Regions:
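Non-heme di-metal
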Residues: 1-169
C-alpha cells in the first residue's frame, strides 16, 4: 500500500473508532431510553464497519488511526451531577455521586431523540464524505471497502433525515 492509501485508511479507521467512542459514551450518559437504544444501534453499525476495516488491515491498525473530529465527543465525555455539580468522566461514571451520594441517574443528560438523529445525520454525511475522499486515494479492495462504507453512511444520513422528519411532524 502506498503512503496516500495508508493515510486514507488511518482517517477511515479514525472516523469509525471516533463514532464508536461517541455512541458508547452518549448511550451511557443519555437519560431517555429511546435515545439510549438509538445510540446503541448507531454504535453497532459503527462496530460492524470496524470489523470490515479490521478484516482488511488487521486489528493492530487501530493504534495508528487518525481521528477527524466528526463527532461531538466533548458533549458526552464528561457528566455533571445535577444536584451538586460534581463532574466525572463518562467512561467511569459511578453508581452514585462521590460528593453528595445521589444515584447515578443524576449524572445523566436529557438528550432529545431529535438531537440524537440530528447528530447521526450530520456525522454520517461527514463520514460518508471522508470515506469517499479516502477511497479516491486508494486502490483495489481498499477502495471498494471505503466506497461501501461511504454508501452505508450516506444511507444512514438519509435514514436519519427521515427519522427527523417523522419526529418533527
Amino acid at each position: 500500500k502506498d503512503a496516500s492509501e495508508a493515510d486514507a485508511l488511518k482517517h477511515a479507521l479514525g472516523a469509525v473508532l471516533e463514532g464508536i467512542a461517541f455512541y458508547e459514551l452518549a448511550q451511557v450518559v443519555s437519560a431517555d431510553t429511546r435515545v439510549k437504544v438509538t445510540f446503541e444501534d448507531l454504535g453497532r453499525r459503527k462496530a460492524a464497519q470496524l470489523a470490515k476495516l479490521e478484516a482488511l488491515v488487521g486489528a493492530q491498525a487501530k493504534d495508528s488511526a487518525l481521528y477527524p473530529s466528526l463527532y461531538p465527543l466533548e458533549a458526552v465525555s464528561r457528566a455533571e451531577c445535577y444536584v451538586c455539580g460534581y463532574i466525572v468522566e463518562t467512561k467511569s461514571m459511578p453508581n452514585q455521586c462521590p460528593k453528595c451520594g445521589t444515584a447515578r441517574y443524576t449524572f445523566e443528560k436529557e438528550i432529545a431523540l431529535t438531537k440524537a438523529w440530528e447528530i447521526a445525520a450530520e456525522t454520517s454525511r461527514k463520514s460518508a464524505d471522508l470515506f469517499r475522499e479516502s477511497a479516491g486515494a486508494s486502490h483495489g479492495r481498499t477502495r471498494a471497502l471505503l466506497e461501501e462504507l461511504g454508501k452505508e453512511d450516506q444511507a444512514l444520513a438519509a435514514e436519519a433525515g427521515k427519522e427527523l422528519a417523522e419526529l418533527r411532524s
